[in-house]
Amino acid sequence: MKEEIIERFTTYVKVDTQSDESVDTCPSTPGQLTLGNMLVDELKSIGMQDAAIDENGYVMATLPSNTEKDVPTIGFLAHVDTATDFTGKNVNPQIIESYDGKDIVLNEQLQVTLSPDQFPELSGYKGHTLITTDGTTLLGADNKAGIAEIMTAMDYLIKHPEIKHGTIRVAFTPDEEIGRGPHKFDVKRFNASFAYTVDGGPLGELEYESFNAAAAKITIKGNNVHPGTAKGKMINSAKIAMKLNSLLPADEAPEYTEGYEGFYHLLSIQGDVEETKLHYIIRDFDKENFQNRKETMKRAVEELQNEYGQDRILLDMNDQYYNMREKIEPVIEIVNIAKQAMENLGIEPKISPIRGGTDGSQLSYMGLPTPNIFTGGENFHGKFEYISVDNMVKAVNVIVEIAKQFEAQA
């Protein structure tokens, strides 16, 4: 199974599928359609039914039930796009057999080294087969590892008809990394009672809580005048932007928070004297705290509007997704089945909140409760991203075991 997974995964990551928030089309980039069409062909070749891609880049397929029991239809999902944080073009995966626990030189010329000194969890992978980057791109394990694992699990179930299961639906979605993954997802057509995203990190991750999330875009309009004659006339929008940021709690940023703590994150700032634009994301697990954070942002803007004028500072704030716990707790048995599946395989479930979001965050509010399970990847979204093939095999086994458990408990 290891060779199958390596072959699939290394093929997928070589297709540039980085999404693009500045584009309104779905999918936002053509590479996502390229990979989607490849996946449809592969789904058909392994024997999946109804494999197709729609005009928006959503791939769906079915593995029919092979049991006489009345088993709920379950789904497994992964996303085809990679993050905007770091380039995903010309990915050149490196395979490290039987990792020795020492530094891994990713790129000698650029002096890029993946070291246990910087990433202590790396030491725990001694003896594993690892796949890394070449130090110039991200890897794309988020979320092409999930695609490879779902594909391999379906292939395994088809080749082992003695394993009884209900109907299984599979979907590969576009534009998850820019928050649009489920926007055009047809829940009715998918027709599953429950689903799992295979979009987590290290071995054993099982998540059914996500942030409540909002984005805030602020435009500040200044007044540029020659600095030699600027007294009483110039309004420096960049300085107002600095002032705005100072009105937010300095210690409530991603670099200072963990666990259930929320934050304000200044994603980008672009500007000059005449105009400055700030892009924040706001995150919190607790609904009331989430509302309070948005109010804090509004008050900061209003304070500056009162000082500089209503029309000089414009706030565009909108909710992105909500904590899926509220929709999953009423059907907590789907989390318990995944937990049991891991325990049956000798894997310790690590149930923790996602300090982020998945497609499941939105899908759960669209009527498809969708917790998240691990892929085996580490250090997503950058050149130090890597994944254990050994743990990818375990993710495949968990998918198969979840299918078995739903049938056994029906």
UniProtKB/Swiss-Prot annotation:
Required co-factors: Zn(2+)
Domain of life: Bacteria
Database matches in Pfam families: M20_dimer, Peptidase_M20
PROSITE patterns from the UniProt entry: ARGE_DAPE_CPG2_1, ARGE_DAPE_CPG2_2
GO biological process: peptide catabolic process; proteolysis
UniProt entry keywords in alphabetical sequence: Aminopeptidase, Cytoplasm, Hydrolase, Metal-binding, Metalloprotease, Protease, Zinc
GO cellular component, one term: cytosol
Amino-acid positions noted as binding Zn(2+) 1 in the UniProt annotation, renumbered to this chain: H79, D142, D199
Residues the entry annotates as binding Zn(2+) 2: D142, E177, H381
Predominant localisation class: cytoplasm
Note accompanying the cofactor annotation: Binds 2 Zn(2+) ions per subunit.
Gene3D superfamilies assigned: 3.30.70.360, Zn peptidases
Cellular localisation: Cytoplasm
Catalytic reaction list: Release of the N-terminal residue from a tripeptide
EC number of the protein: 3.4.11.4
NCBIfam families found in the cross-reference section: peptidase-T, PRK05469.1, PRK13381.1
Chain's role: Cleaves the N-terminal amino acid of tripeptides.
Family: Belongs to the peptidase M20B family.
Protein name: Peptidase T
Organism: Bacillus subtilis (strain 168)
Origin organism lineage: Bacteria, Bacillati, Bacillota, Bacilli, Bacillales
